[in-house]
Amino acid sequence: MELLILKANAITTILTAVTFCFASGQNITEEFYQSTCSAVSKGYLSALRTGWYTSVITIELSNIKENKCNGTDAKVKLIKQELDKYKNAVTELQLLMQSTPATNNRARQQNQQQRFLGFLLGVGSAIASGVAVSKVLHLEGEVNKIKSALLSTNKAVVSLSNGVSVLTSKVLDLKNYIDKQLLPIVNKQSCSISNIETVIEFQQKNNRLLEITREFSVNAGVTTPVSTYMLTNSELLSLINDMPITNDQKKLMSNNVQIVRQQSYSIMSIIKEEVLAYVVQLPLYGVIDTPCWKLHTSPLCTTNTKEGSNICLTRTDRGWYCDNAGSVSFFPQAETCKVQSNRVFCDTMNSLTLPSEVNLCNVDIFNPKYDCKIMTSKTDVSSSVITSLGAIVSCYGKTKCTASNKNRGIIKTFSNGCDYVSNKGVDTVSVGNTLYYVNKQEGKSLYVKGEPIINFYDPLVFPSDEFDASISQVNEKINQSLAFIRKSDELLHNVNAGKSTTNGGSAGSGHHHHHH
């Protein structure tokens, strides 16, 4: 870790943050609901990104005048090679600048489209605020404004012409170094350098620029996560410290710099007036410490031995949920949230806002207050879902499903249906030829028994291909089918009434839908 070389004030931030982290402890619990083949993991705390903080980072460059040395000294050759790399990087950035999201040149964008499109579709709206700042820097005079603000200091708040104030930082001054330290030595000392340190120092300073250039170049001007070349750990901590957020939010961010990096963007902006400027867009966690829980769901099917005659339903509301201002923020793509011990970092851009009644779906899927989401099918394929503290196992047909301990081998064989096993003493779950490793997190699991709700449905009238449905929609379809059956019963009855024997009702008249 890079903690040792930080400035004193950053160290104290980190230490307090660390103690804070251990104090919060981890009380993850899990409930498995047999009736709906789902499980909820509770005890997490939120860190929801609700906004962006943009900051401008600058590197001062030197327009190198021709270097007069043509000597054969090995060290001078190294310096010349390094200066060539430097010049190539600057040229590369200038070319790149003409095709980054900040430039408004239409014609040029057409031919850059291929290079960019696939990427920007993914993060287009995500980087809107960073791109906006980046565009302002292209206006006449903006770069000079920043440059002069950073003349005598490495950090300054600059008010841009669109009225937005941004914190600007100068992280590397290659101009000063090349013009005042490097070139005078090379030119003065009859083209030979006595100490190799000069070469090494330049290589190190230059390396950062080369890496930044490479990253921007490979990623068409927008990178995420933000690497340590774009922003070192101490620079990032110092930025966090200057952000307009509460101390709790600062602690949270300083304590999780890796996740902050993953949720941040670096956007190439401009290179002119001997300055390279890029925008770093950091997450603002406006909601922290509210409860979060994760819902895991797996297919629940009937278990008739006759192949192809089974019906299945699966809850489709799996994902992360966090309390947020009286409602619930729901993150359907669980993998977009990053979990660090019991802390869940999610982005509200990927969320839906739901009423808090959505929780009723866990305890009573037929509740009248919230229409719970399900999908239906006839494919009783076996599978397993690894939860925070165990595994849900959907075992159907002739598949072999087992749970094993690494020392004792198989310790449980699952029969057909949906079941759950906690991670106590269990290391792996195997379903057919797929092996799953369970999470080794500590916590209490609760197995809530209940009649599997799929057994309440009549296979004859079950709508078995509803991809995106709800309990009430499925019931509606069933009622339509039942009405249809009643109607055909009547028709048959009328036809048969003319004959001597009446048919006592046809297929389905004896079947009725059981309600909870």
How would you name each of these model-derived features?
Residues 110-123:
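Short coil/loop "hinge" linkers that interrupt or connect long alpha-helical coiled-coils or helical hairpins
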Residues 1-19:
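Classical eukaryotic N-terminal signal peptides for Sec-dependent ER targeting/secretion
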Residues 120-133:
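Membrane-active amphipathic alpha-helices enriched in small hydrophobic residues
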Residues 4-6, 131-134, 138:
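Aromatic-enriched hydrophobic runs in primary sequence
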